[in-house]
Design a protein with these regions (language model features):
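Long, charged, low-complexity, helical-prone intrinsically disordered regions
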Residues: 1-171, 175
């Protein structure tokens, strides 16, 4: 019978907020889908949690050009941020992000940071879809390069690209 490391509901919510900030990487202290399922957490409580996490040195604030609200990241991730900012040998890579990837939890933040609007259209009736049934955002380096609709054909082990939509053709390099 070990004691509960989180003595009350507030401590539990605080722990979950810190975990969410770590999962997404960068969040703001405002209403967000990133806070879903942190039961009964009201705005005033969230604001208090952020104040405490800041005063305890568990999160750090950062200002991003073009965004009025401060954003926050975990203090334990600061060395990683410094490494990324100092990396002169950076080579961008391409990632297809799953619709429920934690990076995409706050769609409004993604729009503010990247100018990229994403909606998972799996439950949208076909005639109302803008893109497709199961479209994945394409992250290339530090930008959203587009969207891809692909299907894995299990029998042939082939990835069939049904459609691709580019956000900015200047990102495309053909060798």
């Amino acid at each position: 019978d070990s004691p509960d490391p989180l003595p009350d509901d507030f401590a539990h919510k605080k722990w979950r907020v810190l975990r969410r900030i770590g999962a997404v990487g960068l969040l703001w202290n405002r209403p967000s889908d990133a806070w879903l399922n942190i039961w009964d957490m009201k705005s005033l409580e969230r604001i208090q949690i952020f104040k405490e996490l800041l005063s305890e040195g568990k999160i750090l604030a950062v200002q991003v050009e073009g965004i009025s609200a401060e954003l926050y990241y975990r203090a334990e991730d600061h060395p990683l941020l410094e490494t990324v900012l100092e990396n002169r040998d950076y080579k961008p890579r391409c990632e297809f992000l799953a619709p429920l990837d934690c990076f995409l939890w706050d769609r409004k933040l993604i729009k503010a940071l990247f100018g990229f609007e994403y909606s998972w259209e799996i439950y949208t009736p076909a005639p109302k879809r803008k893109y497709g049934f199961y479209v994945l955002p394409i992250l290339y380096g530090d930008r959203f390069a587009g969207r891809i609709e692909a299907v894995c054909q299990l029998k042939t082990n082939v990835l069939l690209v049904k459609n691709i939509w580019y956000e900015d053709l200047s990102l495309i390099h053909i060798s």
